[in-house]
Every structure is written in C-alpha cells, then in structure tokens.
Amino acid sequence: MRASRFFISTLKEAPSDAEIVSHKLMMRAGMIKRLGSGIYTYMPIGLRVIRKVEAIVREEMNRAHAIELLMPLVQPAELWQETGRWDKMGPELMRVKDRHGREYAIQPTSEEVVTDVVRSEIKSYRQLPLNFYHIQTKFRDERRPRFGLMRGREFTMKDAYSFDRDAEGLKRSYQIMFDAYVKIFNRFGLQFRAVAADNGAIGGSGSHEFHVIADTGEDAIVYCPTSDYAANMEAAEAIAPAVPRAAATQTLTKTATPGKAKCEDVAALLNLPLAQTVKSIVLTVEKEDKGVVSKEIWLLLLRGDHELNEVKAAKIPGLTDYRFANEAEIVEWFGTPPGYLGPINTKKPVKVVVDRTVAAMSDFVCGANEVDFHFTGVNWGRDLPEAMVLDLRNVVEGDPSPDGKGVLAIQRGIEVGHVFQLGTAYSEKMKATYLDENGKPQLIQMGCYGIGVTRIVGAAIEQNFDDRGIIWPAALAPFEVVLCPMGYDRSESVKTETDKLYEALLAAGVDVILDDRGERPGAMFADWELIGAPHRIVIGERGLKEGALEYKGRRDADATAVALDDMLAFVQARLAA
C-alpha cells in the first residue's frame, strides 16, 4: 500500500465530545467519523483494524467447527413476540414498520432468528451437535451512547449459537467455544480475564464474560490473586463471616440523631465505625389479580459501608420484578421518610431480607422509623426476629474468596465477549425440537457466544497507548510496517532503495505501507506514532551513504541502525518475536 493512494486524515486535537482515550485517539487517527449519536463511519484505517479482528475471530470459529451464515439485520416482530422479548427488551430494541404496517426489529442479537432456522431444518439427533455463527451489524438504541465504539448504537458483533441433544452436549460445546475465545484473545495480544457472570435478560443459566483489562473499564472484575476464582461484580459471591455472631452487650436504646439521615453521619455523631450501622433499602413489587393491583413491600438490610447488588436482589423469589419504593410508599409502610428507616416497629408489615454480614452483627445501629431518631444496641432474636438471610451485597477488596484460597481483589475491565449456556430457554418457547433414537421429540439445548468486534478495537487502544498515540498489538495494527523515506520525490537513491525494500517486504507477506505523501519528517513521524504502526523504517541519504537504515519499534525508546542488506531479515525477526 502506498500512502499517496490511501486515505489518511489525522487531527492534532480530539473533538470536544470525545471523553475517553480510545475515542479521542480513534478520532484523531482518522479511524472513525461521527455521523450521528452513537453512529460512526469506519474510515479506511479503522476498517483495516476491524477486518483484522474479524479475520482472527473467523479463523478460530472455523477451527472450532462453527459454520458461518449471515442472518438479517431486520427481523419480523413475530419471532421476538414468540419469546416475549419484543416487550421485555424495552426501548433499546429498535422497532420499525414497513409500508404495509408490519412490525420489525432491527436486531441487537439473533437468538430468535437462529432458533427459527434450526427448528425448520433440524429433524433428527443425527444432525446434532451443530454450531452456526455470523459477523453482523447490530443496533441497540442506547439511552446515552458514549465513548465512541465502546458504547455506540450501531456496532459489529460475532454471534455463535450451538445446538445439542442434551445438557452434557451443551457443556462440551460451551467448553469448545470458551477455549476458542481464549485463543482469540491471546492472538489479539491483549491482557484479558474470563470471569463468571450472570445471564441477565438473555436467559438461561451459566455464563462467562471476557474482559480486556483497562483502568477506564466500566466493569468491576473480582478475582483472587492466589487462585483461579474470577467473576464480575454482579456474580461475585460475598460469603458469610467466618466468626459467629457476638453476644449482645448493649440494651436497645432510641437515640436522637437530629438531621442525620445517612449512615456515615450517624456513625460520626455516635462516634462509631460505619460498619456498626445498618442501612435499609425498600423495594416494591406490584401484583395484579383480576384487575386489582396490590403492593408488596420488602425491606433489605445491609451494613452501612456495603452496597446493594441489584442482580442478587432480583434473584430473590418474589422480587424478580421489583422497583425501588417511592417516598409515598415508604411513609405509608414505615411512618417516616427515608433516612430513618429500620426493621423495628414498621407501620405496616414488610418482608425482611438480611444480608449475610448483617445477620452476623450484634449491638448495631438502625433507623427507629421516626424522624431524627435511630436505635442503638440492636440485636437479633431479642429486639427483632431472625429474618431470611441471603447474599445481597457487592463484594469489596479484601473479602474472603468464595473458593477459600485467599482474599478478593478488584480491577477494571471492558467486556468484549460473553458466552452463555442457554439450555432450553429459547427452544422451549419456540418449539425447537429433534427426534431422538426412539423417535420421540426432545428440546434442543442451546448455547450462545458473542464477541464485540468493534468494541475490541476501542478496548485494545484503552490498554495500549501513550502520549503520542496508539500502540497496536501486532495482530491488530492497520499496517505492520511503515516506510518513511526522507525526500522520496527528490532523491533517486532514496526512492530506489525504498522501492526495493517495499517490494521485498510485500513479497515476504508483510503488511507494509510506504509513506510517499511528501510530508515533512516531523509530521510524517507524528502521524504514524498517532496511528500506531508497530514498526517504522526511515530511509535517508545520509544513512544510505553509510549503508544503513533506521529502525524504530513503536514501543522502543530509541532508534536502531540496521545494515541495508540486513533490514528485511531484521524486520521479519521482529515480526516473529
């Protein structure tokens, strides 16, 4: 590739709406161009990176015996209505009508379509197992698109779907795809971690997320440095305290706490550690019976320094469709506004669930259900009955690891892949069956496996950059090598030797670009450091007189002089390293 016949358009400054490093550098390097909110044109340099991501993904999917197809972007509403996701997904699912009034979804994912394909094509157990995948544009109408390709509305993903006879077959397919993902991310040259995760709205049971490690990541990754335990924050278990509950030493006392509605303020007023306080979180569940709507109020108790894990709360039987109670509901059930709530003397009966840590507390502080008052010296069994005890909270650094092999640490990550064991969540709703050896219909066991192709591009930058620009891992760079001739259009010797090296690199299969734009050296070097070419070779008259060229790796502090005749072998060795 010659730069004069390619399109390169760099910026000295990032647009004001670019917030994170990857967004800024992609805009400055001319990789993407904003068309609308969360919608980007992939410019030539950006598209080259995307194609390299796709190529690696495709190779490993094929190696794992997945079969490529391509499902439509626009999908009939009827399929989504079969699974209930037409209504369940809410406004992030883009819905459109054609000229005949028929409704369609602009797909954010393709479980319904692939299940429809399989239920019409798979008849016998002899046709299983099967794995289809595609690499396709998706659209999710994000409430707040931001961070460039990290959270856009239109993006590219690889989706694979496995189909098996039974749960054991699904586990085998799942492991094959899990292993393929590990190979993919290793080939990308990224630091990543696979973590246990919650299935969320997609359904099924059992899943893992793949996160690229980055300080700017939106997700908290929980892991144990001394074992293999890893989970995302939603799925990480906070185990019960190992020590038994201490005996009560204080009497129950109603204590004035004027104007102190937060646990932190109450603890400071009473000169107590925050961990001695208990916070009250009120949830509402609405139930309808024969057109009559009734409300059920739940009170969740957590230690004052802990945070509620909303995913864990939603898994409590009866709380699947909860919402946070409003102030009117709180006053009706507790007799006081938020800030002074507690489990003792509620105005109306509530269902109480206690976090494991709170269940082990004694002599604790909680709201007295009266403005400007809290109870101190509260103890289970004596002052209030023992309640349902569950894991309700987010873990914190230093918590014991659930596997008993150390303590937990937390780092930030960017989710770029997710694998799910769906089971029969979709095949049951869509009646996707096969006939077993006895001619009896059986539900197909499904798995689904996604990789965010365009998100990987942004995540790779978040992990690999400096103050000059992008530092691409070799596998993802738009070009492996850039040739930077000094005076290409003025010096015959520079032009001749540059062209010879260029042709030799091309013949050796190297992805090389020759910068023949005639830019000044400083501007040319700045462009390629910004774009992130891993290997730069400078050809100048002075060096040629000495029989040498200048080589500099993108991560190198200094340039290296290399003999002209040795440069091809030198570059090949660096590429293979």
Curated annotation (Swiss-Prot):
Xref: InterPro entries: aa-tRNA-synt_IIb (IPR002314), aa-tRNA-synth_II (IPR006195), aa-tRNA-synth_II/BPL/LPL (IPR045864), Anticodon-bd (IPR004154), Anticodon-bd_dom_sf (IPR036621), Pro-tRNA-ligase_IIa (IPR002316), Pro-tRNA-synth_IIa_bac-type (IPR004500), Pro-tRNA-Synthase_IIa_type1 (IPR023717)
Record Pfam families: HGTP_anticodon, tRNA-synt_2b, tRNA_edit
Reaction equations catalysed: tRNA(Pro) + L-proline + ATP = L-prolyl-tRNA(Pro) + AMP + diphosphate
GO biological process: prolyl-tRNA aminoacylation
Record keywords, A-Z: Aminoacyl-tRNA synthetase, ATP-binding, Cytoplasm, Ligase, Nucleotide-binding, Protein biosynthesis
GO terms, molecular function: aminoacyl-tRNA deacylase activity; ATP binding; proline-tRNA ligase activity
Assembly: Homodimer.
UniProt note: domains: Consists of three domains: the N-terminal catalytic domain, the editing domain and the C-terminal anticodon-binding domain.
NCBIfam families, per database record: PRK09194.1, proS_fam_II
Protein name per Swiss-Prot or TrEMBL: Proline--tRNA ligase
